[in-house]
């Protein structure tokens, strides 16, 4: 099925379907899902996420950037540290995902 051909949908619905597809593709990654799960409990810095996930700093940073790009995660700087947490949208989406 070609995700760009929607003969039955309005252009607004086409955009919503495309956005939903992109979001589901993003959160279907096991590492990103694990990060979302960890951030659901509290904010964390990259070094804490590294310990929790056994992923490298560069990979965690890459995943966080992707999650920030879709407004699921935000950051807060405190001195030399950056703390990451779920946005309101991130909390809503994460809660929905973990209800499935």
Where are these regions (language model features)?
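Short, Lys/Arg-enriched N-terminal segment that forms or immediately precedes the first helix
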Residues: 5-24
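Pre-recognition alpha-helix immediately N-terminal to the DNA-recognition helix
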Residues: 22, 33-37, 92
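Short capping segments at the starts of secondary-structure elements
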Residues: 30, 41-45
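Conserved segment of winged-helix/HTH DNA-binding domains
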Residues: 16-20, 83-100
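Helix-turn-helix DNA-binding motif, specifically the short coil turn and the N-cap/start of the second
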Residues: 56-59
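Residues within the DNA-recognition helix of helix-turn-helix
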Residues: 63
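A short acidic, leucine-rich amphipathic alpha-helix
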Residues: 49-51
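Beta-hairpin "wing" of winged helix-turn-helix
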Residues: 68-78, 85
């Amino acid at each position: 099925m070609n995700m760009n051909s929607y003969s039955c949908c309005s252009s607004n619905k086409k955009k919503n379907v495309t956005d939903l597809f992109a979001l589901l593709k993003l959160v279907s990654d096991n590492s990103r899902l694990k990060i979302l799960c960890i951030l659901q409990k509290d904010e964390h810095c990259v070094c804490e996420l590294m310990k929790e996930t056994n992923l490298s700093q560069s990979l965690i940073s890459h995943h966080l950037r992707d999650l920030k790009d879709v407004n699921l995660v935000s950051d807060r700087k405190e001195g030399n540290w950056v703390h990451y947490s779920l946005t309101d949208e991130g909390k809503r989406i994460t809660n929905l995902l973990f209800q499935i």
